[in-house]
Amino acid sequence: MWNRLYQYNEEERAIRIKTYFKFLFVREPLKRLLSAYKDKFIGGDAQLSRLDRRYIINKYRPQDLNKNENFVGFAEFIKYFSEDIPRNQHWRQYEKLCHPCLVNYTFIGHLETMAEDAPLLLKTAGIDDRVTFPPIHASTNTDEVLEYYSQVPTEYTKRLGELYRSDFEMFGYEYLGAVKPLLRHNTSKEDNSNR
């Protein structure tokens, strides 16, 4: 239905990059990773994550590989991700996936403020009189983020922060902001245990 940019020759790509209305919606990195995990490992397309599941189980629980046990917990997924950085479009850094430093996007919106950003996008594109956005509902709340990331050792959460640092900085997200309360709590627990 849609051609991808790489399907065009260099000249055709340059014309499209220069003349097309280009927009991008981004999401807070840690929330995006949680959403991808839930979609690919809890629900969604089991075939898509089958190889990832087998790899993770083989790496961290090889004794379970040939059993019927194929559930991958969030902490296992994060450990795998922070050590191996799989090249999957659902969790790859925006910097590498969308190339915001190379493409001059006309509009960049945030998923967290999509209800406000979507009408502005349509107005900027000059189509607000012909198109409307459907109602938008937030999909990942703060309590859920904290619940999932509380299962993850602090060192891996911090490693994720470094992997996604450019996404935090480029798009105005507070560095590790979604899990700051958790990190403060874990740091104070570590400080108390060292006394």
Residue ranges and their predicted role:
Residues 1-195:
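Membrane-interface amphipathic segments in extracytoplasmic regions
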